[in-house]
UniProtKB/Swiss-Prot annotation:
<dbReference type="InterPro" id="IPR008971">
    <property type="entry name" value="HSP40/DnaJ_pept-bd"/>
</dbReference>
<feature type="zinc finger region" description="CR-type">
    <location>
        <begin position="109"/>
        <end position="191"/>
    </location>
</feature>
<dbReference type="GO" id="GO:0006260">
    <property type="term" value="P:DNA replication"/>
</dbReference>
<keyword id="KW-0346">Stress response</keyword>
<dbReference type="GO" id="GO:0042026">
    <property type="term" value="P:protein refolding"/>
</dbReference>
<dbReference type="GO" id="GO:0005524">
    <property type="term" value="F:ATP binding"/>
</dbReference>
<feature type="binding site">
    <location>
        <position position="182"/>
    </location>
    <ligand>
        <name>Zn(2+) 1</name>
    </ligand>
</feature>
<feature type="repeat" description="CXXCXGXG motif">
    <location>
        <begin position="165"/>
        <end position="172"/>
    </location>
</feature>
<feature type="binding site">
    <location>
        <position position="179"/>
    </location>
    <ligand>
        <name>Zn(2+) 1</name>
    </ligand>
</feature>
<protein>
    <recommendedName>
        <fullName>Chaperone protein DnaJ</fullName>
    </recommendedName>
</protein>
<feature type="domain" description="J">
    <location>
        <begin position="3"/>
        <end position="65"/>
    </location>
</feature>
<comment type="similarity">
    <text>Belongs to the DnaJ family.</text>
</comment>
<feature type="binding site">
    <location>
        <position position="168"/>
    </location>
    <ligand>
        <name>Zn(2+) 2</name>
    </ligand>
</feature>
<dbReference type="InterPro" id="IPR001305">
    <property type="entry name" value="HSP_DnaJ_Cys-rich_dom"/>
</dbReference>
<feature type="binding site">
    <location>
        <position position="122"/>
    </location>
    <ligand>
        <name>Zn(2+) 1</name>
    </ligand>
</feature>
<dbReference type="InterPro" id="IPR036869">
    <property type="entry name" value="J_dom_sf"/>
</dbReference>
<comment type="function">
    <text>Participates actively in the response to hyperosmotic and heat shock by preventing the aggregation of stress-denatured proteins and by disaggregating proteins, also in an autonomous, DnaK-independent fashion. Unfolded proteins bind initially to DnaJ; upon interaction with the DnaJ-bound protein, DnaK hydrolyzes its bound ATP, resulting in the formation of a stable complex. GrpE releases ADP from DnaK; ATP binding to DnaK triggers the release of the substrate protein, thus completing the reaction cycle.</text>
</comment>
Amino acid sequence: MEDLYGILGVDHNASVDEIRRAYRRLARELHPDINPDSADRFKAVTHAYNILSDPEQRQRYDRHVSGGFSSDFNLSDLFQSFFDTSAEFQRGSDLLVNIDIDLKTAIYGGSQVVKIDSLVVCDVCNGTRSEPGYKAEVCFDCNGSGVVRGEVRTTLGNLITQNTCSKCRGNGERIDHPCRRCYGNGSRSAPRDITINIPPGVETGMRIKIPNMGNAGGAMPGDLYVDCKVKEHPYFLRDGQDLYCRLDISLVDALLGTKVKIDSLDGELAVVIPALSQNRDVIRIANKGAVTLRGGKGDLCIVLNVLLMQKLDPEHRALLKKIMPNPPKPKLAKRTSGFFSWLKNKFT
């Protein structure tokens, strides 16, 4: 077990004021908004301060360290009593932002920069809440602990209550000369550019969590949540793992077959159109579809749309009758459902 006094760099007989000054110095140095790599150290410093600045909890800790507790004493209860009452004060609030993502980025991943307004550590007072040249004093109401304890009589006995100090709002300090930039809050609203890393396979309705990029708080910042909406693409449609597109071809190419190049989301792609292709035939190209979050990849489904000639001159009409002297007569066809009905709804 690490020594709480050692974490703050103070002696075991340090006064509350010395503990507070040591904490404020370390908090300015290790705050995640200023030094993101020191988040764990900052959390440890904050935990140590909140226990040692509370006379009752400090006494319990000192007794345990000196061996004054029975063997069934659990030190984690001491820490838990702190976490349960002040975790909300320790952490900044979360933020939520909505972004529109193009289909290619949603399928293959990428990054996107968004602008947000969030609370950041004040750049004038560095979170101390006091004007430069001044320092905070210990709050008289809570003696610097940030919490006020009381006793309530009940039929079951006396209950000890613990509430956030209303005078210092849980900070344990009295600010006589509040910072003019942040009005004594220690943080202020400011615009920020945040780069969102989008994993492959994102779909509309999915939420991305970015830890410690929310509002600044008394200790750790909150998290940033990003709600994703995938924009419609003018040519491609995603359905599960598969991508669909429609390819217009001439009657000649449908009858004789051909080879064409199309610009897919994955780059230029050569497509072979078989001879005697029918309208709404589907050419399926494996592993050229959408990527999923679990790493699978679907197919690219190319739906053929055969374009008939809008006009026939007498020469072409005579030629067609010569090629097909006995075409099949029109007749009713059985109604179909399922796949082709779905295609009709999607592409007509």
